[in-house]
Regions:
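ABC ATPase "signature
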Residues: 237-238
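Catalytic Walker B motif of ABC-type/P-loop ATPase nucleotide-binding domains
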Residues: 178-181
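A short, proline-enriched helix->beta-strand linker immediately N-terminal to the Walker B motif
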Residues: 172-176
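Helix-to-loop junction immediately C-terminal to a conserved catalytic motif
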Residues: 50
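Conserved ABC ATPase signature
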Residues: 153-157, 161
Length: 261
């Protein structure tokens, strides 16, 4: 079974129909890039999957857990159960969303330590559990090249470093799928490369990812599959070679040609 299944997802804001019946699947270890013009519905897909927005209708399944079923959308879900499901996915935002009052290590471990408090043996093993979270966080920070910045605060970091902290924060929770919402859009061009390098290394480790991006060459290099969104629908879907080198849709050709000039 696919690790992510989205069926006929629809979402409107007021009278504006943003998603008009989006369906796709993703297998474990795959990297999906979602491309398209601003306003085409890319970010709304991510927000609906991550339960930051409630879809109007459709179906979302993550790791064999029903995240949304339009036929039962009015049914109240237990808050603890909803939180448990949300931890199956990680979302890296455009604008970092780090806590300025906490240092790098604290930012990375805060959510994991709050989650750990729900463990039945937390009180008896608090020190050991928190120590293990710190160890895991340091290991991940080493992978993203920030081990020497553990005690630094966000204001002391470059934009690229802050984004790498936010990636580490998501990874420490061990999500089944990691989502990126235009992770380089808030960065200067010279800092973009360091983030793309981290994402590429995650792809090589077979981390399952969904990436909304405007970086076409990167999407082509790192993706298992690519979706081109246009006006709330999937205009084209396929391998990077199919979508970028041999697009079937005139609209896809038109969009990609703007990045080749």
């Amino acid at each position: 079974m696919s690790i992510l299944e989205v069926k006929d997802l629809k979402k409107s804001f007021g009278k504006t129909e943003v998603l008009k019946g989006v369906s796709f699947t993703l297998e474990e270890g795959e990297v999906l890039s979602i491309i398209g013009s601003s306003g085409s519905g890319k970010t709304t897909i991510l927000r609906c999957i991550n339960q930051l927005e409630t879809a109007d209708s459709g179906y979302i399944n993550v790791a064999n857990e029903v995240f949304f079923d339009g036929e039962n959308k009015d049914k109240k879900e237990d808050p603890k159960e909803k939180r448990r499901k949300q931890l199956l996915v990680g979302l890296v935002f455009q604008n970092f969303n780090l806590f300025p009052q906490y240092n790098v290590l604290e930012n990375v471990t805060l959510a994991a330590k709050l989650q750990a408090k729900e463990l039945p043996d937390y009180k008896e093993n608090k020190a050991k559990i928190n120590e293990e979270i710190d160890r895991k966080a340091k290991d991940i920070l080493g992978k993203v090249g920030l081990l020497e910045k553990l005690e630094n605060y966000p204001c002391e970091l470059s934009g690229g470093q802050q984004q790498r902290v936010s990636i580490a924060r998501a990874l420490v929770l061990e999500p089944k799928i990691l989502f990126f919402d235009e992770p380089t859009s808030a960065l200067d061009p010279e800092l973009t490369g360091e983030i793309l390098k981290v994402i590429k290394s995650l792809a090589e480790e077979k981390v399952t990812m969904v990436i909304v991006t405007h970086e076409m060459s990167f999407a082509k290099a790192v993706s298992s599959k690519v979706i081109f969104m246009d006006n709330g629908v999937i205009e084209e879907e396929g391998t990077p070679e199919e979508v970028f080198d041999n697009p079937k849709s005139h609209r896809t050709k038109e969009f990609i040609s703007k990045f080749e000039d």
